[in-house]
Amino acid sequence: MTEEDGKTQGMKVLGILDIHNTPCAREAILHGAAGSVAAGLLHFLATSRVKRSFDVGVAGFMITTLGSWFYCRYNNAKLRFQQRIIQEGLKNKVFYEGTDLDPTLKKTGDK
């Protein structure tokens, strides 16, 4: 990772996915690696078949990585949506503050 003009060069996986600039990529790959080791090792201990255990490990990596990726991206999208709603609410509160349209003012029966 070299510093050039204040920017860091990201690490790429397979020359495609830039881990530092892609949200949830690092965590998904780490979870996938742990899932592949666990799935492959458990399958090997249960069956003692090396090639099949390797295949199960690769499948475990893909499933765990994709599952972790989609879960993280869903939570990020949900959080962004909630932040957008709160931001609009704050903007409306500032806009209508002190006017007759202010929803926080209690209505009295004077009118």
From Swiss-Prot:
Q: Name one GO biological process term.
A: mitochondrial cytochrome c oxidase assembly
- Mitochondrial intermembrane face: residue ranges? 1-27, 75-111
Q: Which domain of life is it from?
A: Eukaryota
Q: Which residues lie on this side of the membrane: Mitochondrial matrix?
A: 48-56
Has the keyword Transferase been applied to this entry?
no
Provide the transmembrane region boundaries: 28-47, 57-74
Question: Can you name this protein?
Answer: Cytochrome c oxidase assembly protein COX20, mitochondrial
Name of the encoding gene = cox20
